[in-house]
Amino acid sequence: MKKIVLAYSGGLDTSVILKWLQENYNCEVVVFTADLGQNDDMSAIRQKAAASNVKEIFIEDLKEEFVKDFVFPMFRANTVYEGYYLLGTSIARPLIAKRQIEIAHLTGADAVAHGATGKGNDQIRFEFGYYSCDPNIKVIAPWRQWELTSRNSLIEYAKKHGIDVPLDKASEPPYSIDANLLHTSYEGKSLEDPYIEPDYTMLSKSVIPELASDTPEYIEISFKNGDPHAINNVPLSPANLLQQLNIIGGRHGIGIIDIVENRYIGIKSRGVYETPGGTILLHAHRAIESITLDREAAHLKDEIMPRYAKLIYNGYWWTTERKMLQALIDKSQDKVNGVVRLKLYKGSVMVVGRTSENSLYSHNLASFDSSGNYNHTDAEGFIKINSLRLRNS
C-alpha cells in the first residue's frame, strides 16, 4: 500500500482509524472531509488532522453539488423508504465515495478507507460507490479488521496515542449522530430499546411540535421542471433553498420521525430523524405534480418509487437500473412547473394552494355546478363495460 485516502470526520472513530492506518500500513494517509452542511467546525477538523502528521488534507464544500445533483433528483421521485424515511444518510454516501476516489486519483493513492461499522448499511454504500468509480481500488474497512470492538476501547486507544478526545465523547453521548443539509439522524444507545421514548433535547434542527409557534406560517415554493427554485418568490440556490426550508420547518416542528427500518444486511434498526426542509419539499412536490402530471404518469411514478428508494437505500446509486429509472423520472418532470402554497403548524404541513401554467386541472369538469363538455350519460356505458368481469364472476 503506497497511500490511503480516508473519509474523515474528525470524530472519535475516524481519528482513531487515522492513527491505526498510519501504524498498521506504514504509509501516508490523506484525509478527506466533505462539508455537506453538517455544521462541523472545519478549521478544527483540519487542525486535528494536521496534529496527526497528515500532509494532504482535503476539506471541500460540496453542499451545492449534494443538493443539486443528489437530493433534488431523488425528490423528483417523491422518494420515501418504507413509508417514512427520506434517505438523508443514504443519498450522501454516493457523493462522498465519488469524490474520495477522485482525490485518490489526484494524489496517487492506491487505497481508500472509511469508518463505517460492520453491522451497518454505510459500509455497503461506500464500497459500492468506490468500486463503481474505480473497480481496481483497494478498500480498507478497519471496523471489519481491528480488535477494537467497543467505544471504550476506542477511547483507550485514543488516550494511549495522544489523540484528543472531546469531553462529550469521553463521557459517551447517548446517540450516534449523522448530519447533513437534508437531515440529522440519531441511533444507538437508549434508542436501541424501541419502546423507550427518545429524549428530544437531542434535536438540533427542530423543536418538538408542542413547543412550536402557536401561529401558523404560510409559505410558497416555486418549481421548474420538478425542482424547487424559490421560496416566497425569492430565487435561491439549491443548498440555500434547502437550508432556508430547514430553518422554517424546524421552528414549526416539521419532519421529526421515530422509526424502525430494515437494513440491507438484515438487521432492524431504530432511529430518530429530523428532516424539516425535506418534509416540506416532499409535500410541495407532490402537490405541484397533482395538477401537472397525467393520472397514468403519476401512478407509474408511484409504482416505481419503492424500487427506486430501495436502490438508493441499499447503495446502488451508480447502477444502470437506477440511472434508467432516473431518466424516466426526469422526463416526467418536463411540465412540473408552478407554485405551491403551504401552511405550517405544530408539526404538520398542509397544502392549501397550487397553481401552474401547465395545469391539467379543469374547473369546469371538476365543478358540481357545471358539466363543461362532460356528458353524465357517458358514465353509464363506461360502468357497464368495466363491470363485465364483476357481473360474470
Curated annotation (Swiss-Prot):
Subcellular localization(s) per the UniProt record: Cytoplasm
Residues noted as binding ATP in the record, renumbered to the chain: 7-15, 34, 115
Main localisation: cytoplasm
Molecular function in Gene Ontology: argininosuccinate synthase activity; ATP binding
Transcription regulation listed as a keyword: no
Biological processes, Gene Ontology terms: argininosuccinate metabolic process; L-arginine biosynthetic process; urea cycle
EC number from the UniProt entry: 6.3.4.5
Ligand binding (L-aspartate): 117, 121-122
EC class of the enzyme, as a word: ligase
Alphabetized InterPro entries for the sequence: Arginosuc_syn_C (IPR048268), Arginosuc_syn_N (IPR048267), Arginosuc_synth (IPR001518), Arginosuc_synth_CS (IPR018223), Arginosuc_synth_type_1_subfam (IPR023434), AS_cat/multimer_dom_body (IPR024074), Rossmann-like_a/b/a_fold (IPR014729)
SUPFAM superfamilies: Adenine nucleotide alpha hydrolases-like, Argininosuccinate synthetase, C-terminal domain
One GO term describing the cellular component: cytoplasm
Chemical reaction(s) catalysed: L-citrulline + L-aspartate + ATP = 2-(N(omega)-L-arginino)succinate + AMP + diphosphate + H(+)
Chain positions recorded as L-citrulline binding sites: 85, 90, 121, 125, 176, 185, 261, 273
Pathway membership: Amino-acid biosynthesis; L-arginine biosynthesis; L-arginine from L-ornithine and carbamoyl phosphate: step 2/3
Classification via Pfam families: Arginosuc_syn_C, Arginosuc_synth
Keyword field: Amino-acid biosynthesis, Arginine biosynthesis, ATP-binding, Cytoplasm, Ligase, Nucleotide-binding
Listed HAMAP family: Arg_succ_synth_type1
Quaternary assembly: Homotetramer.
Similarity remark: Belongs to the argininosuccinate synthase family. Type 1 subfamily.
Name of this chain's protein: Argininosuccinate synthase
